[in-house]
């Protein structure tokens, strides 16, 4: 979708995906290497998992209850200050104490819990969790259990997988982990405690999901099949597509494994996207006179997506449509454009009931492809926008509203009134630290707002640009202010593309 927007983003993605598993990159947005396994599923499908299932007789799975929320930032001082009960008594000023300060500063000075989401939180959590791992290994060795011989323990973030020869060993390992974790205020989730004899299958839903995924994949030719053909054919095979049967089987799967619904939806959308994305290697998706079949696939994708319309799944679905646009020319072909609009409107309930933050990229897509929603749907979205109080959502929706000049003027009036209100709410002291400042950095370069509103936004920023550089904080404020006051359409928010 962003290929037309920024070549640099695409180039970066292509280079990064050569180093990192592309599926992991698309699913998590993780632009780094995770070693040794990219995900739990890659671990449970590995040779190491199989070997442990053959070598050991007992298996157990436990996890830390509300792991990130339970991590006490002062625990990082305790990691290196032995016998320190009150963290204020910690005197060793090193990395662990700095971590404590940083974590509190990004969490409103609270020492309870790590912010869930940022990869920084996961990295910092590993410092503490690996400290516990080392203690457990040493304590078990002192009790006569040797890692790799008597047992194997694997941890993926807060999930712990235990293999041992006897149930007694398993119980001892769990007790040892529990004692070590309690020192840092971490507890087990008693509702997710699993014991079993090997070989063990953790994801019973996965086999059935793979079977359905394979059925979907049979609708397409594999690249190797096309490569070996004398007469080149499109990726999508000719013949009847039993969409209703696939939908029914999908519902049965979701109903059987309701707790895995998000993963099942992700699996099926990835299957469709992976097959459709083979187009990038120079293959056609459809025969020239059978492009109508595209809407059968899109309807299937929208149906699956409607069960879990999260941000990740939104990106996958939009990507499918953009791949198809090369052959269907939604913006130029009047019939295909109308079919796309009808398809989107048929699933209006997704946008009416979904989380706005998960749906925000749809608004930019709708603008690019001239897709107006139903008026009833827009009324619901407008109400949600007011409740969310999110400048990014307002910016995206303002872009969407441009499909009709009168509607755009209406939304713009609301936005300008909101901006003026936010400016008036910002105090003169430390505007950067105030929530309303997000509206300033989002809309300061907006090409649609009036001159008076733009001047009001700049009035918040200019004092920072002219303040004396008496300390590091003022220098940083000046850099930010000079960046925001540039006469450019693409700053914090890239208005120049729209």
Regions inferred by a protein language model and the residue ranges of each:
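Conserved two-metal-ion catalytic palm core of "right-hand" nucleic acid polymerases
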Residues: 1-93, 97-116, 120, 473
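Short, glycine/acidic-rich hinge or "gate" loops at secondary-structure transitions
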Residues: 10-16, 88-97, 141-154, 189-195
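Amphipathic alpha-helical scaffolding segments
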Residues: 74-86, 130-131, 177-181, 196, ...
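Helical (often loop-to-helix) elements that flank the catalytic cores of nucleotide-handling enzymes
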Residues: 164-188
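Right-hand nucleic-acid polymerase module
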Residues: 50, 58, 62, 97, ...
């Amino acid at each position: 979708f962003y290929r037309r927007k920024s070549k640099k983003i695409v180039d970066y993605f292509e280079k990064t995906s050569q180093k990192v598993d592309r599926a992991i990159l698309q699913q998590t947005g993780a632009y780094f290497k995770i070693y040794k396994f990219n995900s739990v599923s890659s671990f449970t499908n590995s040779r190491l998992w199989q070997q442990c299932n053959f070598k050991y007789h007992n298996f157990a799975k436990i996890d830390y209850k509300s792991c990130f929320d339970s991590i006490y930032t002062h625990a990082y001082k305790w990691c290196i200050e032995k016998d320190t009960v009150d963290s204020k008594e910690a005197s060793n000023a090193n990395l662990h104490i700095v971590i404590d300060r940083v974590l509190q500063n990004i969490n409103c000075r609270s020492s309870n819990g790590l912010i869930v989401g940022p990869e920084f939180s996961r990295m910092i959590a590993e410092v503490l969790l690996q400290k516990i791992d080392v203690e457990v290994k040493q304590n078990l060795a002192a009790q006569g259990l040797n890692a790799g011989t008597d047992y194997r323990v694997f941890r993926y973030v807060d999930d712990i997988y235990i293999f041992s020869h006897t149930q007694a060993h398993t119980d001892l390992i769990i007790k040892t982990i529990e004692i070590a974790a309690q020192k840092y205020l971490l507890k087990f989730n008693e509702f997710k405690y699993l014991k079993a004899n090997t070989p063990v299958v953790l994801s019973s839903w996965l086999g059935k999901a793979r079977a359905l995924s394979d059925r979907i994949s049979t609708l397409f030719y594999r690249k190797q099949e096309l490569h070996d053909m004398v007469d080149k054919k499109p990726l999508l095979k000719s013949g009847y597509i039993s969409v209703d049967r696939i939908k029914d089987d999908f519902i049965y799967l979701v109903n059987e494994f309701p707790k895995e619904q998000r993963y099942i939806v992700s699996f099926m959308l990835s299957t469709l996207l992976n097959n459709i994305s083979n187009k990038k290697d120079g293959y056609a998706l459809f025969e020239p006179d059978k492009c109508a079949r595209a809407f059968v696939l899109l309807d299937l994708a929208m149906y699956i997506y409607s069960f879990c319309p999260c941000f990740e799944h939104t990106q996958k679905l939009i990507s499918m449509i953009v791949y198809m646009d090369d052959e269907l020319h939604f913006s130029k072909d009047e019939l295909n454009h109308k079919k796309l609009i009808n398809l989107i409107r048929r699933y209006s309930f997704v946008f009416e009931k979904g989380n706005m933050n998960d749906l925000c990229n749809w608004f930019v897509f709708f603008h690019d492809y001239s897709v107006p929603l139903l008026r009833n749907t827009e009324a619901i979205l407008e109400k949600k926008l007011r409740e969310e109080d999110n400048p990014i959502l307002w910016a995206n929706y303002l872009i969407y509203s441009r499909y009709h000049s009168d509607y755009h003027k209406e939304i713009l009036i609301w936005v300008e009134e909101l901006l003026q209100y936010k400016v008036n709410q910002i105090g003169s002291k430390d505007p950067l630290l105030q929530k309303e400042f997000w509206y300033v950095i989002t809309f300061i370069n907006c090409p649609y707002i009036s001159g008076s509103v733009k001047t009001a936004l700049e009035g918040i920023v200019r004092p920072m640009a002219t303040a004396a550089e008496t300390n590091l904080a003022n220098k940083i404020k000046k850099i930010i202010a000079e960046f925001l006051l540039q006469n450019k359409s693409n700053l914090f928010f890239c208005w120049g593309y729209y």
